[in-house]
Amino acid sequence: CAPITFGAHSFVGPQFKAYTVQHPLDAEERNAWYERALPITVGDNCWFGGNVTVLPGVTIGDNCVIGANSLVTKDIPDNSLVVGSPAKVVRQITEADKLGLKELLG
């Protein structure tokens, strides 16, 4: 096993999955039960939509949003909006994305 680490204030939707075990492609190694585990690290303030899958060895930066049904196979930089299978960075999350709810709700 390898650790799965979440930063502060990160949330996951229903059916979130994170896999740390990596199996070899080579049949001989696989039949001998060789495998390894790679850690998964999630930064602060991340949000994962429903049915997201994260594969072994991935690091997700701070302040990321991962859209529903995404398959995360590679590292994701800070402040990224990510969607798809395989998941791709669509754009960076900026100050313009704030809804101003804090001010509206007082």
Residue ranges and their predicted role:
Residues 16, 54, 70-72, 87:
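Short coil-to-beta-strand initiation/turn motif
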Residues 47, 65-67, 71:
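A generic "structured core" feature
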Residues 61-64, 77-79:
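Conserved catalytic segment of ABC-fold P-loop ATPases
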Residues 99-106:
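Acidic/histidine-enriched, glycine/proline-rich intrinsically disordered or flexible terminal extensions
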Residues 1-58, 93-94, 99:
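Flexible, glycine/small-residue-enriched loop-and-beta-strand segment within the central core
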Residues 2-4, 70, 78-80, 88:
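Glycine-centered loop/turn positions within well-structured domains
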Residues 74, 91:
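Short helix N-cap motif at coil->helix boundaries in the Bergerat
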